[in-house]
Amino acid sequence: MTSEFLGVFVTFFLGGLLGLVTIINPPATLPFFTALTRDLDDRETRAMARRACIYCFLIVVVSLFAGGLILTAFGISYGALRVAGGIVLGMLGHGMLYGKGDAVESMSHANHQNPAFFPLALPGITGPGTIAVVIGLSTEIRELDAWGKELTAYLAVVAATLAVCALEWALLHSARAISKRMGAAGIEVLTRLMGFLLICIGVQFIASGIRTLVTSL
């Protein structure tokens, strides 16, 4: 029994970690964050990085636990959500792979009262793709055959979210130094690689969704 729960934890932790790291793509937020904070001193920059990562964690956790309720309220099946989420992820991955314009860049000079939340945390770090990944994981968790496994899977995804937010914070905390070291070319290569992985995750979501829809007929 313990090995079963451990297997569930490892599976959902790694799945959540890979999905979130790929869609959030922490290094890709560095140029935007650097532009957004270029007029701030080091203390203000670190404070914004910390607040943004806290917001990101809350957004993901709320999406994880409330996703099922939202689906029920609108009468959306898990299979349909997975197919739709897979399409969204595939489109986002295609844009990253082929270098389409990033919507975040267009907001880099925006002036908002709380830029740590908008546009940095949402949609700069956690956008629609992130929410699609998390709700997709939520649908998989709800199909487990025991409440103990569901609880274990939820804890695994929360732990993965915490790990990704910690990574994001570490990168944003050192954004200015890292951007200089990687250069524009390095960040572009990494973004394209993440785009390809995102397409793969999207295809997997679509296949899983179609399988669920077919078996429910």
Q: Predicted regions: what is each one?
A:
Residues 1-22, 99, 106-121:
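Small-residue-enriched transmembrane helix starts and helix-helix packing motifs
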Residues 47-96:
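Membrane helix-loop-helix hairpins that form the core translocation module of multi-pass transporters
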Residues 12-64:
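Juxtamembrane transmembrane-helix termini in multi-pass membrane transport proteins
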Residues 12-29, 78-88, 154-168:
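Structural signature of hydrophobic alpha-helical transmembrane segments
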Residues 75-76, 170-190:
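Membrane interface segments of multi-pass transport proteins and intramembrane proteases
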Residues 61-66, 125-139, 197-212:
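Hydrophobic alpha-helical transmembrane segments in multi-pass integral membrane proteins
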Residues 88-108, 201-212:
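Transmembrane helix exit motif
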